[in-house]
Amino acid sequence: VGKILDALKENGIDDNTLFVFTSDNGPWLLYGNHGGSAGALREGKGTRFEGGFRVPCVMRWPAKIPDGSVCSELAGSMDLLPTLAAIVGTRLPQKRIIDGKDIRPLMYGESGARSPHAAFYYFSPDGLVGVRSGRWKMLYPHNYNVPLQPGMDGMHGKYGRKSIDLALFDLSTDVGETKNLASQYPEVIEQLESLAEIARKDIGSRSEPGPNSRPIGR
């Protein structure tokens, strides 16, 4: 990273170059000492917990991004395409569904800027597993993989299985997803259920595909 930044500076283009450093997913804990660490986050890659999805993102653009600014609003790598297109003035294809949003207000530290995503959905190959809106994240009952016997030195280990009941987490105070608040906030569950229904009608599941479902990975 340092060498890249040095090269930008040496060529006199660092002030007006957007530099993005991020990851596509959390640590693959099955690989043990080569798998990384999720720190205070729950689980890792392959799950719908924060350890699988929440990743660091560092952006540098001296001409546009305020030095030392921090953003805690929800955004993801899918937002890079529409954001970069907007920056360079390129129109997005009209015949494709683009899931990402333009997050320039968040990048530029604009006062009062909020996440453009009303909801963020968590899917598995079988269908919808959870939904997040703002500070609240709801997960439906499902089974998930955990490292039963982590590997070592680049070799993967063995998976075990765990299950979770209907769960509600307040990520503003419990980023580790340790306190299930589902029974305490039925009104929040109801709100998130209404958002989940939108995704069900749009994407559907493996057994009942929605009008905008598409093959995994596409």
Language model features: what each stretch is:
Residues D15-N16, L92-K95, G204-G210:
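Surface-exposed patches in mature extracellular/periplasmic domains of secreted proteins
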Residues I13-F19, R54, P116-H117, S133-W136, ...:
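Loop/turn elements at helix/coil->beta-strand transitions in domains of secreted/extracellular proteins
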Residues G2-E10, L30-Y31, S37-I97, K101-R114, ...:
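Substrate-binding rim/cap in mid-to-C-terminal beta-strand-loop elements of soluble/periplasmic
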Residues N25-G26:
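Active-site metal-binding loops of divalent metal-dependent hydrolases
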Residues R114-H117, A196-N212:
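Bilobed periplasmic-binding protein-like "clamshell/Venus-flytrap" ligand-binding domains
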Residues K45, F49-E50, Y122-A182:
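C-terminal, low-complexity/hydrophilic appendages and adjacent surface loops
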Residues L18-T22, A40, C57-R60, P82-A86, ...:
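Structural recognition of the beta-strand scaffold that forms the well-ordered cores
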Residues Y185, I189-A196:
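Short amphipathic alpha-helical coiled-coil/interface segments
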